[in-house]
Regions:
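C-terminal substrate-binding subdomain of Rossmann-fold SDR/epimerase-dehydratase oxidoreductases
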Residues: 1-137
Length: 137
């Protein structure tokens, strides 16, 4: 069984791995504009273009209902999950999402792979990988 917290009343902003890799690759090409200013930037200013580092959210900016996510996995697998509905965990939040405005400004795009496509791709990869692995054993 899978534990489903807050009785499934949650939303999450899922990001497909290929999108994540592409964004990180593009971000790695961005070099601070003025190397002479690196020492003048305060350590807490991660948004400065001359900081030696920067925090950038990478995500679809499109929260998905957890139950829809599970239904999509069930559809791809052709199986119904055994669900164990539970109360929300202490400290958890019902909804999360990624603000990707800075990401779009920096690299000109943000992740856009639909959750249904990402799940389908992942399930296909997983089944293929583990069927080949099991054949070798």
């Amino acid at each position: 069984p899978i534990d489903i917290y807050n009785h499934g009343k949650m939303k999450r902003d899922f990001t497909y791995i290929d999108d994540l890799i592409n964004c990180i690759y593009e971000l790695s090409k961005i070099i601070p504009e003025n190397k002479n200013n690196l020492l003048k930037v305060s350590n807490d200013d991660s948004l400065s273009s001359s900081a030696p580092w920067r925090v950038v959210n990478i995500g679809n900016n499109n929260p998905v209902n957890l139950m829809n996510f599970i239904t999509e996995i069930e559809k791809c697998l052709g199986k119904k999950a055994i669900k164990n509905f539970m109360d929300i965990q202490k400290g958890d939040v019902p909804n999360t999402w990624s603000e990707n405005k800075l990401l779009r400004e920096l690299i000109g795009f943000a992740p856009e792979t639909k959750v249904s496509s990402g799940i389908k791709n992942f399930v296909n990869w997983y089944q293929s990988y583990y069927s080949h692995k099991n054949e070798k054993e």
